[in-house]
Structures are given as structure tokens and as C-alpha cells.
A protein has these predicted regions:
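Phosphate-binding/switch region of NTP-binding enzymes
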Residues: 112-188
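Short, low-complexity, polar/charged sequence segments that are solvent-exposed and flexible
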Residues: 14, 63-65, 174-176
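Glycine-rich, flexible loop segments associated with nucleotide phosphate handling
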Residues: 38-43, 85-88, 175-187
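N-terminal cationic-hydrophobic initiation segments that often serve targeting/anchoring roles
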Residues: 31-35, 103-106, 148
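P-loop NTPase motor core
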Residues: 43-145
Length: 188
């Protein structure tokens, strides 16, 4: 996808895969040539898993359309929700493709590690009606559940920040309110 985190790691060998097709080409090359071209490769890091699924959706739509283009009454899919007959079957096929590729890497002797983005999601407890926030992944829960079920460990990093509002001295001439900015007081 459009992640460039590898730029900040000294000595890392990285292959930018901005399309899912490129991801498949790179991983297939590693799988096919592990012993000859990549004998010391131990792990592939996917930065980020949510971006991988984002670039995978248009790939799956195109693949689905190519596979069915000559069929009578076929209406090309424009989104993943329309692919594979709808009802989340497009997402399920994309999950299958991603998981199969990760399994092939593992069988070739290459582990995988992925990073992802997190977000805060507000929920209401069904019994008490209380609202609460939880930290979760910034991707479809369907995709996350599939990856979570194939992972040995999942960690979520969270930074607890204390914020304060500070006046910066500028006053709005109409409302007479001073302009404020938010500053980080502490992080842990």
C-alpha cells in the first residue's frame, strides 16, 4: 500500500508493494526462490495489514470480473460488496487469498509479521446500557478476525496522553474569546 515505514529502519531490505498484484508477485517470487535467492530471509513484514486489505479489494473485484466476463447475464462488480455474488463473499475470497499466501510463505520457511493502525471504537453495553471505548484495529472486523485467528500473538500499542488547553493570547474581536491550542502535557 502507501506505507513507507521501512525508510526509518537502518539496513532493512524493503520492497514497496503499492498494488495487491505486486504483493502477490513479490511473495510468489520469495516462495518459489527461497532456497536460491533468499536463503537468509527469515521474515516478511507487512506494513500495514489494513493497507494490504485495502489494496486487495480492487484486485479481487478485477479478478472476479475477469473470471466471469463471458457468462450470460453477468454484471461486472464495481465494489467488493458486489463481487462473488455479494453477501460478504468478496471479502471472504480476499481473506482466503491473503491467508493462503501467508501459509505458502510459512511453508517456504519465511515467517510473517504485520503492523496495523488502531482506532478507538465506542460501544454500548447490551445489558447495562453503559457506553465504553475500546481500542481496536482500523480495518474491517471481518478481516481482523480472520488474521487474528491465524496469528500467534497480537499486540496493540496505546499512548496515554494528558492534554491541556492553553490560551495563545489572540482574542476574537467579535466574540472576545481568546484563541486556545491543545498541548500535550505528558505521555506514557
Amino acid at each position: 500500500g502507501s506505507e513507507w515505514g521501512s525508510e526509518y529502519i537502518n539496513g532493512v531490505v524493503a520492497e514497496q508493494t503499492e498494488t495487491f498484484k505486486k504483493f502477490m508477485e513479490v511473495t510468489n517470487d520469495i516462495i518459489k526462490n527461497k532456497d536460491t535467492e533468499y536463503p537468509n530471509l527469515k521474515v516478511v513484514i507487512i506494513d500495514t495489514i489494513d493497507s494490504l486489505f485495502e489494496i486487495g479489494e480492487p484486485y479481487l473485484v478485477k479478478l472476479y470480473n475477469q473470471e466471469h466476463i463471458g457468462e450470460k447475464g453477468f454484471i461486472p462488480a464495481k465494489t467488493i460488496n458486489a463481487a462473488e455474488g455479494g453477501f460478504m463473499h468478496g471479502q471472504d475470497r480476499l481473506i482466503e487469498i491473503v491467508i493462503n499466501q501467508l501459509v505458502k510463505l510459512r511453508k517456504a520457511g519465511v515467517g510473517f509479521w504485520y503492523t496495523g493502525h488502531v482506532k478507538r471504537r465506542s460501544n454500548d453495553d447490551a445489558f447495562s446500557g453503559e457506553s465504553y471505548d475500546m481500542i481496536t484495529t482500523n480495518m474491517s472486523q471481518r478481516y481482523f478476525a480472520a488474521i487474528r485467528n491465524k496469528s500467534h500473538a497480537i499486540g496493540i500499542a496505546y499512548i496515554d496522553r494528558t492534554l491541556t488547553q492553553q490560551e495563545i493570547g489572540k482574542e476574537n474581536p467579535i466574540t472576545k474569546e481568546k484563541k486556545t491550542i491543545t498541548r500535550i502535557v505528558s505521555e506514557s
